[in-house]
Structures are given as C-alpha cells and as structure tokens.
Amino acid sequence: MAQNGSEGPLLAGVAGRYALALYELAHDQGQVDDVAKNLDAFDALYRESDDLRRLVRSPAYSAAEQTAAVGALLDRAGISGLAANFIKLTAANRRLFALPGMIRAYREKVRESKGIIRAEVRVAEKPSDAVIEDIKASLRDVAKSEIDLDLHIDPSLIGGIVVKMGSRMVDASLRTKLNSIRLAMREAR
C-alpha cells in the first residue's frame, strides 16, 4: 500500500483507519479471507434488517446496549473470531455507524492486496452467465488484472452498458446515445 497519506479515498478517515488496522491484523494472523467472509455475512444481515440498521445508525443506544445487541446477533449468525471481535470493538468505541464504510474499505484493501480491480457495470437487464463472463474477460484484457465485477441492473439505460473501473468510465448505453441525438437535433434548429 502507498504510504504518506496517498491511500485511496476508501482508506481515508475513520473507516479507512479501522479497516486498515483490521486488515494488517488479519494478514499477520493469516485470516484475511476468513475475516472478509464474516464481514460479508454481517453486511448481508445489515442490508436485510431495518432493526439492525436502526441500531447501527442511532446515537440513542449506549455503547453497552449496542455491544450486547451486536454480540447476540453475531452469536446467532455464527460470525466469530477476529471479525466478531472487530465488530464488537466498533460498538464499544461508538463507531458502529461507520461499520458499513469499514467493511467497504476492508474489501477494497483485500482486492488491492490481491491485485484485483473492481469494475462497476450497469446494464438495462440481467445478462446471461456467458455474457457476464465475456464482460469479465474483456475487462481483464483491458485492465491486465483480475476483475471483481459489481453488476447493477438499471432499466433506465434502455440498452447497452456503462462500465466504471477506478477513475475511468465508459458509457455505451442507449439512453446516452439517444440523449446525444436529442441534443444534436436541438442544436440543428
């Protein structure tokens, strides 16, 4: 990782510092992938549960209440080890609100350490598995690296594809082409 404050935006701030500390500890203990799996399991629970999101976001709960509630949830979900201790620590330190950002930053650090580039791809409708593999292969050729594909379905695109990798973006959607034609026709008047 780059030093002297040149980390990416996800590794900046409180979330980035916590994620980096967790990554370094997990790396030292040979548990990087186990921690990632457990954080992903917690993140899935977070996205599915309105009650958990309220607990995480609300300052009305004390650190002790958050720690106890999160501890019970982790036990029920089978999330243990370093990831569970980390989540409990964020609750005890009143940083639970930043946990979703910490999880994103941890994922980014894991990808970076493995030389994997995240590509956000938006399409109008769900492509077949073969098309998804073709997209990955094309992006791998361009990036000269393994790709972690984050696929989003966006019917407003009408057709085509929008790809974002790092700071680069290619918009080959039908919506953008139609808007360009519309703009050209207005200028021709």
From Swiss-Prot:
Gene giving rise to this polypeptide: atpH
NCBIfam families linked: ATP_synt_delta, PRK05758.3-2
Function comment: F(1)F(0) ATP synthase produces ATP from ADP in the presence of a proton or sodium gradient. F-type ATPases consist of two structural domains, F(1) containing the extramembraneous catalytic core and F(0) containing the membrane proton channel, linked together by a central stalk and a peripheral stalk. During catalysis, ATP synthesis in the catalytic domain of F(1) is coupled via a rotary mechanism of the central stalk subunits to proton translocation. This protein is part of the stalk that links CF(0) to CF(1). It either transmits conformational changes from CF(0) to CF(1) or is implicated in proton conduction.
Family: Belongs to the ATPase delta chain family.
Subcellular location: Cell inner membrane
Gene3D superfamilies per record: N-terminal domain of the delta subunit of the F1F0-ATP synthase
Name of protein: ATP synthase subunit delta
Membrane topology recorded in Swiss-Prot or TrEMBL: Peripheral membrane protein
PROSITE patterns in the cross-refs: ATPASE_DELTA
Recorded GO CC terms: plasma membrane; proton-transporting ATP synthase complex
Quaternary structure, from the entry: F-type ATPases have 2 components, F(1) - the catalytic core - and F(0) - the membrane proton channel. F(1) has five subunits: alpha(3), beta(3), gamma(1), delta(1), epsilon(1). F(0) has three main subunits: a(1), b(2) and c(10-14). The alpha and beta chains form an alternating ring which encloses part of the gamma chain. F(1) is attached to F(0) by a central stalk formed by the gamma and epsilon chains, while a peripheral stalk is formed by the delta and b chains.
GO MF annotations, alphabetized: proton-transporting ATP synthase activity, rotational mechanism
Superkingdom as given in the UniProt entry: Bacteria
InterPro entries cross-referenced by the UniProt entry: ATP_synth_OSCP/delta_N_sf, ATPase_OSCP/d_CS, ATPase_OSCP/dsu
